């Protein structure tokens, strides 16, 4: 990811910040925010396994704990032995919040952009979930491809009507991967679309969050997706109370992809919280 940050934005000490993207996304997704962060910050934005430019493991599905191990290894290589700042979106936010509880000594501050977790599951859902997973394995995962990068950009704008054409054109350069037949596939392993056979165990997640020692900024969007309705429920507020040093913010005029919709607002929150 390019680091064309504001040349005049040398506010505060230099620092290293890791930018962690979400599910079916790529690290370049943070470019619009990165352009607005201080020029003396070092920004490191890896692609999760099976996304973007990262390799696809020889497996038929992905296991969430592997992302924790990947993050642990990346930090050991790029920032050994020091607490780091994490800015993470959606799935990346879920990984980062768990990591901050499992390795509390490694995270100084965390900005979580809509990494809200999932609604609580019930044990009675397990039989159908395993069956759904087996059926999906049998059918095999797939993602549609496109005849041009312009078509990829159009798909991105359909998914997010707030996305500007110039933003979509930029993202399509990173999301659209040229194939031997001249078509363009999305930069994500289709196996990521397989349902997780393991239910979301909110009690386990909450216990991990209790061990977070970092300052945490929890950022939601004004126009969250329908499946985010559960964050307004008392049970979810109780869940968040497990995080001891928690601040909250809402980005007005933005949907789930807030770092595309309102990059200026998101960059301001990040800069003020981490500085």
Describe every region a protein language model picked out.
Residues 1-18, 38-42, 79-82, 117, ...:
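Alpha/beta-hydrolase fold catalytic core
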Residues 82-125:
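Conserved hydrolase catalytic core segment
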Residues 44-87, 91, 251, 268:
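Active-site loop/oxyanion-hole signature of alpha/beta-hydrolase fold enzymes
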Residues 211-254:
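Conserved loop-alpha-helix segment in the C-terminal half of the alpha/beta-hydrolase fold
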